[in-house]
């Protein structure tokens, strides 16, 4: 993100005659876009130069209050056109902005960037942005979990057909299935928080991480160099800085960051794929606006476009983790510049993509529609087959022979299956059992034996316990931001 490069005035290109990433122009929230903007980045560079100067002054370097005040007064006075022209000539973005800052701070010009290297502003700014980007994502993820938790609680007892291999399996409940989604997202919330809290500042380290330039500034005073590093780290709001760096902070950090975002992408993709499949089965739908058009040619269509968008972007988010993996592996010795162009793209895109999928998933989770009658019909189509073992056990209790009963059930089941598969009819296994005198001892028990709630096990209790013991405590730190609604740009 921050290293030598050439914008050459391209930031002025806008409108409809130049490419812009759809992540910024179409999808991501304004607050996340601002965090990765040039304005935020270069303003943070200036803030870092100010913090460095303040700390150096405190530790005895000849820096005046007037110079400090001049820097403070010009933090937002950024001449982007001048910076672009400087970079065009110098082919170095940091020095271009040193000159631009110095131009509006003539008294402080001599002490701007004193003792520092490009990565002092570049890498430290990246770390500040990464931390702040996590701070934007975490409440959004918490809100998604909260909305889905409300949905799971509401649907905790509604029996639905479970699927393994996307083939009918035993019953579960709509709420229990939702808890599978929530559990993955809870793991993501914990992982994002962990990586955010473990971020360390690069600090004040010099060109190859040895702090040689600062040791020279302070005339060999080790303690003052240590104090300088600590003071700037604290000003930036970090608890710790790396003790060891090359010119850059280790690019393993970027792997950690994008790995947890990619893992979030996998969770979102699974959830939204399930919703898309359920929409096809007509059991559940995402919100669909009154004026929304599903197809230009088929007016009856209600396509799950929000879930499809999430899946589309989640694939991109998962793929991005390959960039920092490759980058970290080819950083020769103290650093090479082939990390720079790649990181300008992948770090921003990862957070803008994660931001978009969370905004969209919150919107989906706030308006999920369930169709109980459709669910009930599908359950009734499969339940007779599931109930055969219970029917056999009831017959044995009534005095029947298990083997004889099993054979009769097998024959009747095959006949019923033929009606479903070959004739397209409904499952009539229960009608066949009711018509067979052999099963007369249990005819009065059939309704009880076919009660769907008796096939869902402890699903309802599991939902309640999971929400109370795991989800609610995890969401407690985010209570104050739970009421925020998701706004989709498109």
Swiss-Prot record:
Description of how the protein assembles with itself and partners: Homotetramer. Residues from neighboring subunits contribute catalytic and substrate-binding residues to each active site.
Cross-link type Glycyl lysine isopeptide (Lys-Gly) (interchain with G-Cter in SUMO1), residue numbers: 421
GO term, biological process aspect, one: 'de novo' AMP biosynthetic process
In-chain residues carrying the UniProt-annotated modification N6-acetyllysine: 153, 301
Gene Ontology CC: cytosol
Keyword presence, Metal-binding: no
Top-tier EC class: lyase
Catalytic activities: N(6)-(1,2-dicarboxyethyl)-AMP = fumarate + AMP; (2S)-2-[5-amino-1-(5-phospho-beta-D-ribosyl)imidazole-4-carboxamido]succinate = 5-amino-1-(5-phospho-beta-D-ribosyl)imidazole-4-carboxamide + fumarate
Function, in words: Catalyzes two non-sequential steps in de novo AMP synthesis: converts (S)-2-(5-amino-1-(5-phospho-D-ribosyl)imidazole-4-carboxamido)succinate (SAICAR) to fumarate plus 5-amino-1-(5-phospho-D-ribosyl)imidazole-4-carboxamide, and thereby also contributes to de novo IMP synthesis, and converts succinyladenosine monophosphate (SAMP) to AMP and fumarate.
Keywords (A to Z) from UniProt: Acetylation, Isopeptide bond, Lyase, Purine biosynthesis, Ubl conjugation
CDD domains: Adenylsuccinate_lyase_2
GO molecular function: (S)-2-(5-amino-1-(5-phospho-D-ribosyl)imidazole-4-carboxamido) succinate lyase (fumarate-forming) activity; N6-(1,2-dicarboxyethyl)AMP AMP-lyase (fumarate-forming) activity
Protein name stated in the entry: Adenylosuccinate lyase
EC number, UniProt record: 4.3.2.2
PANTHER family: ADENYLOSUCCINATE LYASE
